[in-house]
């Protein structure tokens, strides 16, 4: 697989971005988001990086420094947002409280919080598009996880562009790596000798996603592509029957699928 070609084709086929768009890329410091910002810059898009400093000790410090260096070398503007300043608490504290209060796993909490901060800051930066580094493996895992949870409808928004359409006032979230296998992105990032951390997040253990990733280890990239492509055929039907519309959260004003967004639901008692 040619990762650059697949990204370029996905952007064209799904009309993910225009050259005139202000494209904000959510940078975790890992191989996926680093590759996608590099490729989009190379393809001529107007990109800038947005990194949330999660305050996870040395891990975050190294990511921050490496991303500063990478963006500097590639002439890419970078904004770093301090999670503790944004929320008044560190991520570990919030996770510990929510584990006790609502038995929510760390990755769920981290995902909801990151999404909320990224949306808010993308708007502040005047983004037309907010890019994340989600890849084919992430999407195949989602299909399987939702099926095993007995709730295929959870995948109703699965698409290279979230919601499949633009919502006024919000930066549309797009996933140019939607059809790129993780193994190929890893090869790509290494071939480019990106000076980044290649390990997974140290906090990601003991979660349903981690288990699912392990179960899927024996499935080939081609099969993963078929899973994702077949599910994409189902999405319009799910969407038509779901009645789910993206609305504005009545508390914080961010995009939501119900009156209160997931962030406001989980964070209100902390
Ligand atoms: P993950 O949920 O960690 O697999 O990350 C999925 C995507 O979310 C990454 O490819 C990034 O685009 C984005 N992301 C994750 N962590 C961060 C972070 N600390 N700051 C900004 N974006 C992030
Ligand atoms: Zn809210």
Question: Where do the PLM segments sit?
Answer:
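Short cysteine-rich clusters marking metal-coordination/redox-active sites
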Residues: 1, 248-252, 261-264
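An accessory alpha-helical subdomain
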Residues: 215-234
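ATP-dependent adenylation/nucleotidyltransferase module used to activate substrates
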Residues: 1-157, 182-191, 261
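Catalytic subdomain that performs nucleotidyl-dependent activation
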Residues: 137-220
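Alpha-helix C-cap/termination motif
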Residues: 42-43, 73-74, 124-125, 218, ...
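Short metal-coordination and nucleic-acid-contact micro-motifs, chiefly zinc-binding Cys/His arrays
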Residues: 245, 257
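Cys/His-rich microdomains that often coordinate metals
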Residues: 256, 268
């Amino acid at each position: 697989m040619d990762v650059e070609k697949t990204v370029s084709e996905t952007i064209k086929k799904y009309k993910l971005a225009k050259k005139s768009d202000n494209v904000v890329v959510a940078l975790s410091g890992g191989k996926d988001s680093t590759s996608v910002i590099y490729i989009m810059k190379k393809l001529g898009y107007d990109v800038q990086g947005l990194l949330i400093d999660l305050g996870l000790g040395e891990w975050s410090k190294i990511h921050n420094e490496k991303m500063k260096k990478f963006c500097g070398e590639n002439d890419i503007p970078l904004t770093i947002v301090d999670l503790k300043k944004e929320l008044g608490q560190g991520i570990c504290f919030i996770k510990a409280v929510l584990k006790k209060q609502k038995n929510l796993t760390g990755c769920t909490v981290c995902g909801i919080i990151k999404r909320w901060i990224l949306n808010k800051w993308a708007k502040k930066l005047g983004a037309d598009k907010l890019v994340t580094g989600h890849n084919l493996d992430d999407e195949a895992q989602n299909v399987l996880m939702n099926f095993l949870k007995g709730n295929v409808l959870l995948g109703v928004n699965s698409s290279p562009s979230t919601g499949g359409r633009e919502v006024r006032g919000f930066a549309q979230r797009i996933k140019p790596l939607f059809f790129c296998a993780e193994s190929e992105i890893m090869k790509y990032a290494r071939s480019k000798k990106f000076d980044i951390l290649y390990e997974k997040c140290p906090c990601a253990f003991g979660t349903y996603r981690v288990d699912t990733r392990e179960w899927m280890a024996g499935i080939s990239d081609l099969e993963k592509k078929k899973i994702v492509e077949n599910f994409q055929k189902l999405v319009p039907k799910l969407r038509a029957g779901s009645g789910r519309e993206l609305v504005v959260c009545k508390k914080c004003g961010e995009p939501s699928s119900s009156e209160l967004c997931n962030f406001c639901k989980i964070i209100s008692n902390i």
